[in-house]
Amino acid sequence: MHPFSQLFRNIQSLGEEEVQELLGPPEDALPLLAGEDLNHRVAGLNLQLPTADLDWVHQTNAITGLYSTQTAKFNPEWKQPDFPKIHLSEDLFLNYNNFCGPLTVNEKRKLKLNFPARFFPKATKYFPLSKGIKNNYPDFSIEHFFAAATYLWTLWESGILYLRKNQTTLTFKGKPYSWGHRQLEQHNGQQHESHLQSRESSSMVASSGHILHKQHASGPSSFPTRDLPNNFFGESQKSARTGGSVREKIQTNRLGFPGKSKITIGQQGSSQVSSPRSKSSNFRNQTQANHSSWNQRHPTWYSTTSNTTQSRQREETYSSDSAFKRHSPSFEHEKSEPSSSGLCGGTESLNNTGTSTFCLWRSFYNTEPCGAYCLHHIVSSLEDWGPCTISGDVTIRSPRTPRRITGGVFLVDKHPHNSSESRLVVDFSQFSRGHTRVHWPKFAVLNLQALANLLSTNLQWLSLDVSAAFYHIPVSPAAVPHLLVGSPGLERFTPSMSHTTIHGNNSKLQTMHNLCSRHLFNSLLLLFKTYGRKLHLLAHPFIMGFRKLPMGVGLSPFLLAQFTSALASMVRRNFPHCVAFAYMDDLVLGARTHEHLTAIYSHICSVFLDLGIHLNVAKTKWWGHHLHFMGYVITGAGILPQDKHVQKVSTYLKSIPLNKPLDYKICERLTGILNYVAPFTKCGYAALLPLYQATSRTAFVFSSLYHSWLLSLYAELWPVARQRGVVCSVSDATPTGWGICTTYQLISPTGAFALPIATADVIAACLARCWTGARLLGTDNSVVLSGKLTSYPWLLACVANWILRGTSFCYVPSAANPADLPSRGLLPALHPVPTLRFRPQLSRISLWAASPPVSPRRPVRVAWASPVQNSEPWFPP
């Protein structure tokens, strides 16, 4: 059925004879469809511009336009995902060689791009820590704040993020990579050799905050270490109580003079440095005691451990007694015995660098409640709130990392169909904007026709999903200052509280109770049921940098595509009779039988697990002969969109109001939805040309004719099938004639009036397809070869897409084109049509490795019939 039959019959300005002529033979109808007058008459019905007195429609039942924003919905019961301990094997290249032989040049190139991934932008803009967690949910700002902070700590627990300890030190959990060994300071509580060799000074501050002393020649020295629980967020574990020993060490101060000091060193595996039996007390008494002693010594809220002179201050700072007593108060809890190095006894404590930090949460112990909704009631309800911060297994040196962030974070639904789980969104858009934006490398995108040529086979299909695929790729430690995220802590909810309060100023004490409010009090009570004592840790500010590849950077999709394509190449070389390809985090396998596919799947899961690659077993899909990939259903007959996309298009089209001006934002969104299914319609993308013209900041009025025509067009979908070269012909054109040449005949029709040469060439190709039935056409017009007919008149472009659907084109130079003379009205002697090299679109996609033929020569010592068949290499159909 002609696609315009219903449309032409509903146009009142067209007579019956004119309609029959337009729907008649193609040699008569196609030149008329290219006429400017007819296209203007049809466009006048479908492109009515809105008058000035009509208001634009900004929202339909399913599509929102200008001035209608969709408010984000926060789910208080969002589930935090559990990330596996992702760590790619250090000897990945060696394991590759063991499993599938030597790596190819392309595989080496792709893997070297990812081990480690490097990211060094031209310029980096740093933002204050107060913008670390975006307030995208004003009604649930407190709940979203703690949920986002918990998500970041979960990523740190999984070894995906670094934790900034100071501007030159980072800590993380997991195993270090070889390229970071030179930056190691501490690994599993032991000082690393590279760090000891690089420091020639007599004393240094370790990553845990203790004082490390140079080994004396008289005897070995044991460094003070601490062990945190393996899972801080899980059940509290009882730490072994081991006594400490007091040893005297020769210490050289910073000025070079020797001196003696006493250091309390606990045994390995102990989390208590001082004697827990003699000094144990509950958290409340310890906090009050320290606070009262401070007030006796110092009249102001802030204090230092030094005397007034600078030399005395340096000596006290590096003295083990003064620093150690303040830094590690010992206390005990009935369930857990947290690490003393991370706990501050009073409202002020020493951090990892030896400077004083302010704990807002513990400050409420030492103040009187300001009312019924004071946070003092919550803080005083629990004896032990745990440490203010925690440290990882490994500590490394890093480039200067400021106390700033480079991108904010917020939580959203995992995907539109799963609102029970959350996903972290990181905004690193600064690297894609402005004159300093980073130009990301381009990579090939799968073409629809190429997918049909490669995958439209009768194979058994299986799709695998790499769990947290981006977080498999490590990032160079030097790139950490450019990929910083963080949380401002509880002080964010008090605008009047300054982060830069100097010593001797008690403004924090005065403004501390500005936090207290009924809303915050009730929210923290509810959050305490969820987070428990971890609420104290989340209330502290922190800064983290990405150790693995983040999803918010434009470089990430390119690197992930290189990584997964290398995995697919390994699978293809290890299983020659298997089809394997990858797109982003999806790995697709194909085999001739289900049993063969099951065996391949079992082996791949084992190999990937040995390499440190985690597969999401829950998302493994066995598709049979109907592969679902990228929203398409791929079968042996071709490719069609999934039913959910077809229903979505139908719903959106039916919700469009008629004879009302729609704003251009609605037109843009509707065009994007229709574009996804357009290749499967008769007229293709050309049917949406009127909508494309309306997206240029103008409104669009849907007439009943155009609306009903689109509904009928999208109600009948045709699959995109494989390109097969069977019958071929060659076409050429002049402004007044066409020429068609096949192996058996020459055709030379003429036109009634002159046409542009580009229009005549596409009409000649349509006539050759209609008269000869050839699916392989040769032409010398580059526009026809591209298949993009949207630059032609609208009616001609729609009909040409319908006629040339499923046709392949080959370039034939004009000098060698046998249809050149027939197009000029000359009929020479019939010559054989030149052989057209049919090259279907493959988009440089590799699906399989050629299976080498088996040698027909057998060893003489083999006395039985070999089960190996002598055959040619197998290629998938």
Curated annotation (Swiss-Prot):
Annotated EC: 2.7.7.7, 2.7.7.49, 3.1.26.4
UniProt-listed GO biological process terms: DNA replication; symbiont-mediated suppression of host innate immune response
Stretches for region Terminal protein domain (TP): 1-183
Positions of the UniProt region annotated as Disordered: 185-347
Annotated site (Priming of reverse-transcription by covalently linking the first nucleotide of the (-)DNA): 67
Entry's free-text remark on domains: Terminal protein domain (TP) is hepadnavirus-specific. Spacer domain is highly variable and separates the TP and RT domains. Polymerase/reverse-transcriptase domain (RT) and ribonuclease H domain (RH) are similar to retrovirus reverse transcriptase/RNase H. The polymerase/reverse transcriptase (RT) and ribonuclease H (RH) domains are structured in five subdomains: finger, palm, thumb, connection and RNase H. Within the palm subdomain, the 'primer grip' region is thought to be involved in the positioning of the primer terminus for accommodating the incoming nucleotide. The RH domain stabilizes the association of RT with primer-template.
Name this protein carries in UniProt: Protein P
PANTHER family given in the database record: REVERSE TRANSCRIPTASE DOMAIN-CONTAINING PROTEIN (PTHR33050), RIBONUCLEASE H (PTHR33050:SF7)
Compositional bias ranges of the Low complexity kind: 267-281
UniProt keyword list: DNA replication, DNA-binding, DNA-directed DNA polymerase, Endonuclease, Host-virus interaction, Hydrolase, Inhibition of host innate immune response by virus, Inhibition of host RLR pathway by virus, Magnesium, Metal-binding, Multifunctional enzyme, Nuclease, Nucleotidyltransferase, RNA-directed DNA polymerase, Transferase, Viral immunoevasion
Note: Hepadnaviral virions contain probably just one P protein molecule per particle.
Occurrences of domain Reverse transcriptase (ranges): 393-634
InterPro entries: DNA/RNA_pol_sf (IPR043502), DNApol_viral_C (IPR001462), DNApol_viral_N (IPR000201), HBV_DPOL (IPR037531), Hepadnavirus_pol/RT (IPR052055), Rev_trsase/Diguanyl_cyclase (IPR043128), RT_dom (IPR000477)
Source organism: Arctic squirrel hepatitis virus
Pfam families listed in its UniProt record: DNA_pol_viral_C (PF00336), DNA_pol_viral_N (PF00242), RVT_1 (PF00078)
Regulation of catalytic or functional activity: Activated by host HSP70 and HSP40 in vitro to be able to bind the epsilon loop of the pgRNA. Because deletion of the RNase H region renders the protein partly chaperone-independent, the chaperones may be needed indirectly to relieve occlusion of the RNA-binding site by this domain. Inhibited by several reverse-transcriptase inhibitors: Lamivudine, Adefovir and Entecavir.
Family listed: Belongs to the hepadnaviridae P protein family.
Biased composition, class Basic and acidic residues, residue ranges: 185-198
